[in-house]
Amino acid sequence: MENKYTHGVLFYHEHSGLKNINQGIGEVTTALSSICKHLSIQLSENEGDIIKYCQEIKTKNYAKDVDILFILGGDGTVNELINGVMTNDLQLPIGILPGGTFNDFTKTLNIAPNHKQASEQMISAQVGTYDVIKINNQYALNFVGLGLIVQNAENVQDGSKDIFGKLSYIGSTVKTLLNPTQFNYQLSIDDKTYSGETSMILSANGPFIGGSRIPLTDLSPQDGELNTFIFNEQSFSILNDIFKKRDSMNWNEITQGIEHIPGKKISLTTDPAMKVDIDGEISLETPIDIEVIPNAIQLLTVNDL
């Protein structure tokens, strides 16, 4: 087989979510080495290492001929690579190999959830161009959320039940289990202002969150827009449906309970200050400024057959 690329770099964390990371590396390199003349395998020991390596690739200090990047890991690891690529303006395609709890954006790219199968898909995958979310000085592929979604992420980190991932726990138990905190918000989207009280605000770029599809038919990470959702108190009665695709429900048709506002530039302040979940990583608090950067990143995409 003809090598598509000259020099690929495969990034991974030791704690990637795979039970045996060394075995996992061996399983994916067979396919990746068939499309790269030279494949470097790069361990990221500490948070921030991948961003540092991206800087070295940009300045040619890592190697002079790197022309593709691969990442084996979960959403947090992928998020670090996205930040490294965007911060250093690396115009290189990225192949994502699932290796964590959720790989929401790999579903968008039609990539298999198994890392070995995903690596084999890279052989015939095509490069697609996707929008990126900028949040203050950070970047993300998939979503920005606060309120209930942050409480859920903290539950997962504590080893508790993943509320959005375990849909049977949503609905009747959501108020007793999570006791959603109400907060006041002031939101500006493309110069229009909104204010009120809510338990959750979500701005989405990709159509999957927490492993399930957002039931909104026209949500696309290639349309130059973000979709912001404001959930009011009454909307928790339909939380059973929110992160679960159901024929009987479509967010396009919902007016009561969930307010949907598409837009490109967003400013958000809250009272009190709220933690912010960015692709599963909680690293910021409000106030935040959000914008979509169209056609910002190249990702290997499997053709949807």
From Swiss-Prot:
GO terms for molecular function: ATP binding; ATP-dependent diacylglycerol kinase activity; metal ion binding. Mg(2+) binds at S220, D223, E225. Binds 1 Mg(2+) ion per subunit. This ion appears to have a structural role and is required for catalytic activity. Its cofactor is Mg(2+). InterPro entries: ATP-NAD_kinase_N, Diacylglycerol/lipid_kinase, Diacylglycerol_kinase_cat_dom, Lipid_Phosphate_FormReg, NAD/diacylglycerol_kinase_sf, YegS/DAGK_C. ATP binds at S44, G74, D75, G76, T77, V78, N79, E80, T101. Keywords: ATP-binding, Kinase, Lipid biosynthesis, Lipid metabolism, Magnesium, Metal-binding, Nucleotide-binding, Phospholipid biosynthesis, Phospholipid metabolism, Transferase. The active site is at E281 (proton acceptor). SUPFAM superfamilies: NAD kinase/diacylglycerol kinase-like. GO terms for biological process: phospholipid biosynthetic process. It is an enzyme of class 2 (transferase). Its EC number is 2.7.1.-. The keyword Cell inner membrane does not apply. Transmembrane segments: none annotated. One of its GO terms (cellular component) is plasma membrane. Residues 3-139 form the DAGKc domain. It comes from the Bacteria. Belongs to the diacylglycerol/lipid kinase family. May catalyze the ATP-dependent phosphorylation of lipids other than diacylglycerol (DAG). This is Putative lipid kinase SAB0675c.
